Structures are given as structure tokens and as C-alpha cells.
């Protein structure tokens, strides 16, 4: 085999490696963008409910988007952890076992949020409404008014327990809300082992 032929073959090999690598990179970016779009709407829904239905909250923040298991393209194991601060310097994680071992809901895919790609590669994002029906929202960049929750019985129960246990002070459900609350959204993506969730603070 001549040097010229070897050079051509090597160039072709490098070209194919770059093309394949570029495709994997673009596919990964597409998946990450879907996560960010879906969780942006989901975090807005959670924060809006707390802001409009609870007084005494000074700040609401969210963990990164934690993804665990699968091959990086699975939407099964992903979640965020909302954190609530009262006006007395206390904060409470909406996460089971942190610090109370009670039934705190999971905030993630198939627990209020559905993510996928529709036929043709377009985004597929659904959020739950008050009737516990999944509603398509991928056409929105911000939470539509019709998906502002008016009730969330499980969250209400958890926050009631947090109040009784002294984890949060002065956080009460009412129509006054917390109009001046600081909200810190978080669309950073972290791929982790599920067992490492408790390490985030």
C-alpha cells in the first residue's frame, strides 16, 4: 500500500471519527436542552404555588437537575430538590428523609413531569394540572397561567409537618402568599449516583 493511499485512508478514518463524535455530542446537547426546558417549566410551577399560597417564605431555591442511571439519554431517573427558607434563617429540603423520614414527594420525571422526544425529534414536555392530568407544555418558554396549581395536598401536608416539627417558622398557607420571595432557579445538570443525593446542600 502506497504512502498516498495510507494517507487517504487515515484522513477518511479521522473524518468518520469526527462525524460520529460530533453526532454523539449534538445528541447529548439535544437531550440536555430538553431537560433544561422541561425543568424550567416544572420549577416555575413549584415556585409559583409556594409563592402564591404560602406566607412567611423568604426564599425558594432548587438543586441542580440530578440525573442517575441509564446511559445519559434516559428520562426515568431525574429530579430536583426544592428548598424553602423562612424569615428566621431556617431552611427545609423537600426531600424524603431530609431530615424527617416522611413521605415527601419526588419532584422529577414521572412525578409531575414527563420528558421525551416526539416523532421527528421535537420536544415532548408534559406537566400535571390540578386534576392530575398531564398537559402538553413544550410550546411554552414560561409556565402558562392555566398550569398554576391551586392545590397540592401532598406538599401542604409536608409543610404542615415541617411547621409542627419546627423546621420552618411562620410559614403558613393562606391567600396572602409571599410576593417578595426570592426565587433561585437552577438548570445545571449533574449526573450522579442516586445514593449521593443527600450530599447536595
PLM regions and their residue ranges:
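Short, Lys/Arg-rich N-terminal segment immediately upstream of the first membrane anchor
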Residues: 1-4
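Hydrophobic membrane-insertion alpha-helices, especially the h-region
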Residues: 6-23
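Generic detector of bulky aromatic hydrophobic side chains
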Residues: 7-8, 58-59, 168
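Residues in flexible loops and secondary-structure boundaries
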Residues: 9, 68-70, 191, 195
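N-terminal export/targeting and maturation segments
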Residues: 20-99
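Extracytoplasmic electrostatic interaction patches
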Residues: 98-201
Amino acid at each position: 500500500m502506497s504512502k498516498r493511499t495510507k494517507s487517504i485512508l487515515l484522513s477518511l478514518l479521522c473524518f468518520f471519527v469526527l462525524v460520529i463524535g460530533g453526532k454523539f455530542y449534538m445528541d447529548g446537547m439535544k437531550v440536555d436542552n430538553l431537560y433544561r426546558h422541561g425543568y424550567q417549566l416544572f420549577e416555575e410551577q413549584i415556585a409559583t404555588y409556594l409563592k402564591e399560597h404560602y406566607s412567611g417564605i423568604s426564599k425558594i431555591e432548587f438543586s441542580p437537575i440530578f440525573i442517575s442511571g441509564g446511559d445519559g439519554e434516559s428520562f426515568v431517573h431525574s429530579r430536583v430538590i426544592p428548598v424553602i427558607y423562612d424569615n428566621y434563617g431556617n431552611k427545609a429540603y423537600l426531600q424524603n428523609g431530609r431530615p424527617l423520614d416522611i413521605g415527601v414527594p419526588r419532584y422529577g420525571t414521572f412525578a409531575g413531569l414527563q420528558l421525551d422526544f416526539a416523532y421527528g425529534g421535537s420536544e415532548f414536555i408534559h406537566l400535571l394540572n390540578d386534576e392530575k392530568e398531564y398537559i402538553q407544555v413544550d410550546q411554552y418558554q414560561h409556565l402558562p397561567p392555566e398550569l398554576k396549581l391551586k392545590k397540592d395536598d401532598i406538599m401542604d401536608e409536608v409543610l404542615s409537618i415541617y411547621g409542627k416539627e419546627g423546621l420552618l417558622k411562620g410559614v403558613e398557607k393562606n391567600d396572602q402568599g409571599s410576593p417578595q420571595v426570592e426565587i433561585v432557579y437552577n438548570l445545571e445538570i449533574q449526573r450522579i449516583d442516586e445514593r449521593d443525593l443527600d450530599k447536595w446542600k
